[in-house]
Curated annotation (Swiss-Prot):
InterPro entries: REV_protein. GO terms for molecular function: DNA-binding transcription factor activity; RNA binding. Escorts unspliced or incompletely spliced viral pre-mRNAs (late transcripts) out of the nucleus of infected cells. These pre-mRNAs carry a recognition sequence called Rev responsive element (RRE) located in the env gene, that is not present in fully spliced viral mRNAs (early transcripts). This function is essential since most viral proteins are translated from unspliced or partially spliced pre-mRNAs which cannot exit the nucleus by the pathway used by fully processed cellular mRNAs. Rev itself is translated from a fully spliced mRNA that readily exits the nucleus. HIV-1 lineages are divided in three main groups, M (for Major), O (for Outlier), and N (for New, or Non-M, Non-O). The vast majority of strains found worldwide belong to the group M. Group O seems to be endemic to and largely confined to Cameroon and neighboring countries in West Central Africa, where these viruses represent a small minority of HIV-1 strains. The group N is represented by a limited number of isolates from Cameroonian persons. The group M is further subdivided in 9 clades or subtypes (A to D, F to H, J and K). Asymmetrically arginine dimethylated at one site by host PRMT6. Methylation impairs the RNA-binding activity and export of viral RNA from the nucleus to the cytoplasm. This is Protein Rev. It comes from Human immunodeficiency virus type 1 group M subtype B (isolate SF162). Residues 35-47 have a biased composition (Basic residues). Pfam families: REV. The RNA-binding motif binds to the RRE, a 240 bp stem-and-loop structure present in incompletely spliced viral pre-mRNAs. This region also contains the NLS which mediates nuclear localization via KPNB1 binding and, when the N-terminal sequence is present, nucleolar targeting. These overlapping functions prevent Rev bound to RRE from undesirable return to the nucleus. When Rev binds the RRE, the NLS becomes masked while the NES remains accessible. The leucine-rich NES mediates binding to human XPO1. Belongs to the HIV-1 REV protein family. Disulfide bonds: none annotated. It is found in: Host nucleus, Host nucleolus; Host cytoplasm.
Amino acid sequence: MAGRSGDSDEELLQTVRFIKFLYQSNPLPSPKGTRQARRNRRRRWRERQRQIQSISAWIISTHLGRSTEPVPLQLPPLERLNLDCSEDCGTSGTQGVGSPQVLGESPAVLDSGTKE
């Protein structure tokens, strides 16, 4: 893949194909049978999925030599964060939308409910 150093494109593609094969080797369980049988099949399927996920993480970390987790984003400390609305903050494009209407007298729907 473009911009990657340390491993070739073919090695990365081969690893991805192998992990894809692992996931395809565990199809969804059949919806047939009693409730208990379906529940047991789903439980075994979920366990196999967890095993495949851990094997895939191991393959990526050892074979390709990189972490499965993305690099964490470095955020500034909370003390430095502030909201300063002295400037035009977030109102662009919303001017005139939902502006309040001032009525001379209250409409009939707000009357006390007595008929004249």
